[in-house]
Amino acid sequence: QQLAEFVNTPHKNALLLTALHQNFNAYASKLDASQKNEWTKVKGRFQEIVFAEPVEHLLYMAAESMANKYPVDVKQANAIYEIARQTKFVSPALTGEVMRGLYPLDAFSAVVLTKAIQKYGQNERSLFSFLNSKGANSLSDFRSAHNRTYNLSDVYDYIINNFHSYLSDVNEDSMGWSAILVAIERIETADWQDEDIMKSALEIVKVIGMLNLFGNAGFSMPH
């Protein structure tokens, strides 16, 4: 803050330019209220110029790194890509070839995961951490099956487990995440006769929640 104030004097004829790997507020996420207030003062001395790398570019790099790593169900990958394209969920710049390279991620899960990482993580670093991670909810631990990709429900679980500290703070998406949690709690506390149906209901709620949070303005939900 002192450095910013020093530079922010016209007669000094100086410019302070910094590069951050995440937004200003993210650095203060684990501070107490008093420290967050001080950090807000620091932020006020700067003008933020946000650079968001195109989702298509990040997914192209991811597809290149995943080449031949997983067996591809071409028919399934193409079918899901066509739905994503027709509903305008993906940009025309994102090709079917790239999507096949990302399998077992499908077109919806790949785009949502990347957008979430851009918002809550560290762009390329977080994306490639996901691609190479081990353990619960990871891609390496996922076993694809007939009619089963690493889908939006899986992405929801991964985001909740890996970005919980950020999501637990107030942010622009707080209401959306809260709505999903409320819906999940209602499902889990309902009287279900069939556990498999309950699991399916949970997956549907997670999918709808992810589409609502990360769908672009031109996206229309498929019927």
Label each region the model flagged.
Residues 189-223:
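Terminal-proximal interaction/regulatory segments of ATP-powered molecular machines
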Residues 27-142:
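Amphipathic alpha-helical segments of the small helical/lid subdomains adjacent to P-loop NTPase cores
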Residues 12-26:
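Structural recognition of the conserved hydrophobic beta-strand(s) that form the central parallel beta-sheet
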Residues 82-90, 98-104, 173-184, 218-222:
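Active-site-adjacent bridging/hinge elements
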Residues 101, 105, 176, 196-204:
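Secondary-structure capping and boundary motifs in well-ordered enzyme cores
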